[in-house]
Structures are given as C-alpha cells and as structure tokens.
Amino acid sequence: MQAKLTRRQFIARAVAGAAGVVCLPKFIRAQAVESAAKATLYVVHGKDIPKMFSTGIAKMGGWKSFLKKDGKVVLKVNAAWASLPEQGGNTSPALVEECIRHCRAAGAGEVLLPEKTCSPFKESFKRSGIAEAAARAGGKLYSPEKRHFRNVEIRQGVSLKQAEVVGDVLDADCLINMPVAKSHGGATLTISMKNWMGSVNDRGYWHRNNLHQCIADFSTFIKPKLIVVDATRIMLTNGPQGPGKMAYPNQLIFGTDPVAVDAYAATLFEKQPFSIGHIKIAHAMGIGCGDLSQVKIEHVNT
C-alpha cells in the first residue's frame, strides 16, 4: 500500500505536475508565461472565522486596497443550494456576515449579494443561513430577475462569446468573489472561477458548450478585486449539492489571481491543479498562474 502523502508532499508533486502544460501550443504557453505575474496567496488557518478573516484582509493590505467610501460592494457568495451550513454546499454564513460587517465598517455605501440559485431561492437563502447573516450585517441578498441582467460580449471567449450578467456585478466599485470549495460532477471542482455561474442568466449554455472552456472564458472578462475561498469545510463527494463526504481543512484562501487560488484549493482535494480542465485552460489563456511553483503561498496560523 502506498503511504499517504503529507500536504507539503502533495503540493510539491502538484508543482512538478505543472510540466504537463508543455503539450499546449507554443504560442499559448508563451502567452501564459508572459501574462501570469508572480501571484501571492495567503492561506489562513484556524477555527475562529472572524479572526481568520481579519487576519487575511490585513495580509492583503487592508480594505483601503479594495474599497472606496460610499462605493457599491458586490459580494458573490455561493448560496445556490437549499442545504445546511455544515453540509458545505454554500459559503459559510459566518464568513459572509463577517465580510459584510467589514465592508460596512470600512465605509461601503451598500453591500449587495446577487445569486441565481439552483434550488428555489427562498428555500436556498433561508436554509443556508445566508439570508439571516446578510440581513444582520447590513447586506442585501437577492435573486436576480430577468430585468437585472445585461448582455455583454466576452471578447476573448472561445466557447463563450456573450453572456447575460447581473448588472450589479458589472457596476460594482468593489467586486468580491467568495466561493465555497467543493466537488462538482461536471467541472470536477467548483471554486472561484466556477462560482461566477451564479451571476449569469443562462448557466445551461455553459454545460452544453464545453463547460471547462466556458468557465475559463468568463474569467477573461470578470475581474474581482478580491477572492476569498471558504475552505473551512469542503465537500469531497456528491457535489455540488451533496450531501457528501466532508473534510475540514479549516482554511480561508485569500488572493486576487483566480487561477492560482483555484490551483491551490485543488490540492486540498488531493488533485493535481492541471488535472482540472478549467484551471489548465485558464492558465494557458494567461488569465492567471496555475503553476504553484510560480506562486508565493504564505500560510498564517490564527
């Protein structure tokens, strides 16, 4: 029987596995190398979510790096499923609440949380605990209707050439992506890049037209100022809805490079980052860096 790898050993192997991109066309490899600047991730460990979140924001330079006074903050959480917080189908309501409180304290004019759900939205918002958390902290969680969407062109898209996107996402002064990390039957994993499907009107098109490519295509267009991945608990199987087998990394992952963020999060599932189609494609397209040997990862204990 093969000995179980430590987290450090697994990440080391994932770094070595980055050599797999050599099978990509030369011009695409060159684009990826040239456009992927050295990314930095802060991985905060602990069990006290408010303390973990405050620590991560401080490491990222504080709210002055992201917010302007009276600006519109749009927080893209995962609130798609009518499941309980402990089941890991949605972003932790405690994390959502803490982020909204921080934004309000830092001077945000409003904090909006649009989410096109998979389960009926009233049930999803209530059962996930996110509706109550958002209301307590001064945020507005809502299910977008047809009138809330605007059609946009995805100029660098390969499979996805246009999309109807929630207008508030397009108009945000500060756009924050706060997904939960979990398994997914179609995309293998859903982390930050996949999370944007909850901000578009027709997610079915993505599923029918090369899902991994569409996920990467949309990330050529959408540029959040901050990404915070909820990896306090992760759903290893039966995602995205669950229930499934759970693990408890007790981590929050902070960054601005969606490809680097997702590549690191993939290792929590003992996956090589480039075994995930949309991570490999996004790296090749130059959206960010999925090669963990080129990413600065700072671990912080709280």
Regions found by a protein language model. Give the residues of each.
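N-terminal and secondary-structure boundary signal
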Residues: Q2-T302
